[in-house]
């Protein structure tokens, strides 16, 4: 599995949320038990929850036909504190 993302979106996330897709990938690789769940808002997407800067963050993504993950965005979510 390869994890991909849009470079422009990554720069926007760094500037606006102080979070990068590189941090997400590091967290996913460090915790192999990261389980994709169906995104309740977008049925064609999945989500996973990772901890960035000691705070839970939701990462929506799509799984491509070859099994690669394409990250859409990442956002902090206090509602997920109990999940980590």
Please place each PLM-identified region on the residue numbering.
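Ribonuclease/tRNase effector modules and their secretory precursors
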Residues: 1-84
């Amino acid at each position: 599995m390869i994890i991909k993302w849009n470079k422009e979106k990554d720069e926007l996330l760094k500037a606006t949320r102080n979070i990068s897709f590189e941090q997400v990938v590091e967290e996913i690789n460090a915790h192999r038990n990261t389980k994709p769940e169906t995104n309740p808002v977008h049925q064609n997407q999945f989500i996973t929850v990772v901890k960035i800067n000691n705070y839970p963050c939701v990462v929506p993504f799509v799984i491509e036909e070859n099994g690669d993950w394409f990250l859409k965005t990442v956002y902090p979510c206090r509602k997920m504190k109990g999940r980590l």
